[in-house]
Amino acid sequence: MTQHPPGDDRTNRIVAVTLDEESIGRSGPDIEHERAIAIYDLVEENLFAPEGADGAGPFTLHLGITANRLMFDIRKEDGTPVVTHLLSLSPFRRIVKDYFMICDSYYNAIRTATPDKIEAIDMGRRGIHDEGSRTLQERLKGKVRVDFETSRRLFTLITVLHWKGEGQ
């Protein structure tokens, strides 16, 4: 049997993601498609290492919104709780609002706009997405180590949860 050191890529990763159904707002097919792709991509390739739990994974992640906070419920693959982190939604509000506005522009543009205009809108969309991803990495610092691509995929999922949580 091969031993892998703590912190190796086989253990510091997410193998399953669930979203709190009560936290998910109604969204159109474009957002639902983006959510499904983000979950698939996240599970396929990620770096996710809760502080103090190196080598304890792989992990499952349940995302939701509770008491107007973003909830990361992290468990071992067998369901044993590892840690739950609650993050303020405040740092994400403007970014998510801007992201949804530019996504609406993008989805409208792909139906009628020129390729140059679509590309310009998409560059703006990616820039806002990157900003949200960096903000998430900063908010998770000292709690969960994630790489930038993992943070990008998690930010996509946060956008799905965010608006429903606003009304709670």
From Swiss-Prot:
Family annotation (Pfam families): UPF0262 (PF06793)
InterPro entries in UniProt: UCP032146
Entry superkingdom: Bacteria
Family named by the database record: Belongs to the UPF0262 family.
Protein name, as recorded: UPF0262 protein BRADO6636
